[in-house]
């Protein structure tokens, strides 16, 4: 007998904006999406700020989006949690942070603070770095060095100089800290095992090798002069009198202040993992603190903020009812439909199958805007024909990953490719008498230019996202307005005929 699958399709980075200028979502020719939008119930969901557990006005991101969708409740993000603790003062008694600083003081070694220097709030926040500098000052440390990873992706592409100036002013005011290296996140925060990139960032921080400059401002200005925006700043060692200001040495304490794990793992492993094979390097012995748990298997680090456990996430609850589920995405978003969707748990649920389709190996995705969407679709259709799954979670990475390049024509092509795939998937789900929900985790591709400067915009947005309910049963019905990402899971469970568990505080969006 054919199963009637309930499927959630997440169009990563596909937001809704009334402004047509620089809007790749509006500019794209998307007959399938438009046809479904006009025929079936739809509404808009909030995917940013307080509605997803972020500070007010903070744009959403993929990790936060998938956590909220999978949990069926608002998940207070690490950003909000850490910022709140700094304000309330508990940050300054955090065991792991205090221990790292005490050890540096007792052993008369250096403290290194490494991480993404911006207020983007996706991977890190400059205010958390300032909090660490204040704690170092309170502890009476003098040898405190910052290894700044330049952003230009979650914030404007050439805003790095302003953040360097802001950091230098803060260090002056607090009375501690010097910038030792700067590296574009393209090198320091790779997540695709491109070790030749990571090695350059590592060499700057640990060996004092790489580009040279006499100040961080000089380094970033040179990068701009060479037409390299923040993300692509070559790892640069800041020198005083011809010697590196500092480098990470045995016995030093290191605090990595990024709170998002996926782009923090590789450089962390390069520094601390005794089994590391990415490139040739000598084993360092440092006191290393990760702001959050980057990877359970990293045993040689301390963690400042351990993960909170969420019970009865959508996947866990569906598994507890003896149902089969599938998660499918290409490499770039695979962690999002598995680890993040399951509330930060690596282990698959019982009867949870996973399909990983390799992302194309290109330098930037504007060179291949269709990415692996067609391959993902082919695999999904094959799986649907097996009639095995009660619930399917699918992510199309294109609008987000191509949106991040800032190239509007490519983003338009990305959305057109996804539309083609979306049409095939919708037809197949309807043929199986199933239900398809279409949504996004946050906005991106609907704003491809910075309206204030006219330059390309590479960051996420705070725009709402669509939510479509596609099924034979949905025709002529309607969805509630004013929803948020956390309302998706209760809605899906209702359609599946399951009771919504009490832990899910989201609301079902079906109008009775």
Swiss-Prot record:
Family: Belongs to the BPG-independent phosphoglycerate mutase family.
Phylogenetic placement of the source organism: Bacteria, Bacillati, Bacillota, Clostridia, Eubacteriales
Species, as recorded: Clostridium perfringens (strain SM101 / Type A)
Domain of life: Bacteria
EC number(s) given by UniProt: 5.4.2.12
Active-site residues, as the UniProt record annotates them: 62
Residues annotated for substrate binding in this entry: 123, 153-154, 185, 191, 260-263, 333
Descriptive protein name: 2,3-bisphosphoglycerate-independent phosphoglycerate mutase
Residues involved in Mn(2+) 1 binding: 400, 404, 460
Cysteine disulfide links: none
Keywords: Glycolysis, Isomerase, Manganese, Metal-binding
Function per UniProt: Catalyzes the interconversion of 2-phosphoglycerate and 3-phosphoglycerate.
InterPro entries: Alkaline_phosphatase_core_sf, BPG-indep_PGM_N, Metalloenzyme, PGAM_B_sf, Pgm_bpd_ind
UniProt cross-references to SUPFAM superfamilies, sorted A to Z: 2,3-Bisphosphoglycerate-independent phosphoglycerate mutase, substrate-binding domain, Alkaline phosphatase-like
Catalytic activity: (2R)-2-phosphoglycerate = (2R)-3-phosphoglycerate
Cofactor binding note of this UniProt entry: Binds 2 manganese ions per subunit.
Binding-site list for Mn(2+) 2: 12, 62, 441-442
Listed cofactors: Mn(2+)
